[in-house]
UniProtKB/Swiss-Prot annotation:
Binds 1 potassium ion per subunit. One of its GO terms (cellular component) is cytosol. (6S)-5-formyl-5,6,7,8-tetrahydrofolate binds at R23, E80, K120, K454. Residues 216-377 form the TrmE-type G domain. This is tRNA modification GTPase MnmE. Keywords: Cytoplasm, GTP-binding, Hydrolase, Magnesium, Metal-binding, Nucleotide-binding, Potassium, tRNA processing. Exhibits a very high intrinsic GTPase hydrolysis rate. Involved in the addition of a carboxymethylaminomethyl (cmnm) group at the wobble position (U34) of certain tRNAs, forming tRNA-cmnm(5)s(2)U34. PANTHER family: TRNA MODIFICATION GTPASE GTPBP3 (PTHR42714), TRNA MODIFICATION GTPASE GTPBP3, MITOCHONDRIAL (PTHR42714:SF2). One of its GO terms (molecular function) is GTP binding. GO terms for biological process: tRNA methylation; tRNA wobble uridine modification.
Amino acid sequence: MSHNDTIVAQATPPGRGGVGILRISGLKAREVAEAVLGKLPKPRYADYLPFKDADGTALDQGIALWFPGPNSFTGEDVLELQGHGGPVILDLLLKRILTLPGLRIARPGEFSERAFLNDKLDLAQAEAIADLIDASSEQAARSALNSLQGAFSARVNHLVEALTHLRIYVEAAIDFPDEEIDFLSDGKIEAQLNGVIADLDAVRAEARQGSLLREGMKVVIAGRPNAGKSSLLNALAGREAAIVTDIAGTTRDVLREHIHIDGMPLHIIDTAGLRDASDEVERIGIERAWQEIEQADRVLFMVDGTTTDAVDPAEIWPDFIARLPAKLPITVVRNKADITGETLGISEVNGHSLVRLSARTGEGVDVLRNHLKQSMGFDTNMEGGFLARRRHLQALAEAAEHLQQGKSQLLGAWAGELLAEELRLAQQALSEITGEFTSDDLLGRIFSSFCIGK
């Protein structure tokens, strides 16, 4: 498909609504206006007009908005038709537009892609549009808007500019080795490099917060039957999300709840009790439980405090601990403190966190909530923060690695050429975030995840 085509798509969600919007972008948007409206509306003014079929009969009437390029969202001529939100009406209007030569349905994200290709947005800003639409909390929405307005891009561009100046300095030292001053060893380049590394570390810390805000944390509740896993899910969710009975093995399948802790998304997963399965259905449920455990960010190892006094997970259930993925964080949750009389709270046991609570009464659950937030390093004071995706974190990590390699080359052998190459690679990694250096394949993957009309 060519970027020279004129594209059209519904910009409002499918289904019935008060208003339905069709968006057209491209060279033939002007022809669409003249064919459907009978005239070209005044630029950037709302014009109330009938939307006409090919034979001149009215299909609908509504607001027409005309944005001649390059002063539009996509940088091209853009026409928006805002009519009534009935699916039949919108479908009739869409079919009418597609009878005109040179028009086609837009691919998902193609409007935003054209805005990027026409330098109306950089790649991080374009991604922020999708993140703003998908935001699941007020804090995520505010951070996505900050990214859309360029907060993240400005931080990245500042780093790129600093690296450009540093590269110029290093290249000068390489090209003029006979100067009286040895630029590589006089400490100035090292000081500048340390400054860039410190700035990059600060951006990475904020990006990790932004990624948490966007991606959330996947927490799996696991343990033996009747340990109180479903009761804990209900306590964290604040509602009766799971059936709770005294019958062991009540939960047969995976249950999922999406909550927020001070703005941080938390994906809680309740699983079937782990034991030797009594039938095929239970076996499948236990198998799914292990699949979820292997993909978790953290496991809450639920222990019935009335059955054991042990607190070390390796002592409580060594076979379970041995099967867990290496380096998977575990929080031991000793439940039923209302029965055992244990002191509520959190402590450390052999490198693992231990929380004592009562899922039935809710006592101690707030301690667990705070622990989950702190274990991910989530900061609730993110004024001016931005959202970040995993690819952003990877690019920032790659840039940091190249800068550390460059520093080693500088301090170890005063190797200017190798330092210059590491600086170039770091700059290239950062440029992938904003799209200044990005493969077509990556662009395709990013924009294909967008809504059709965006």
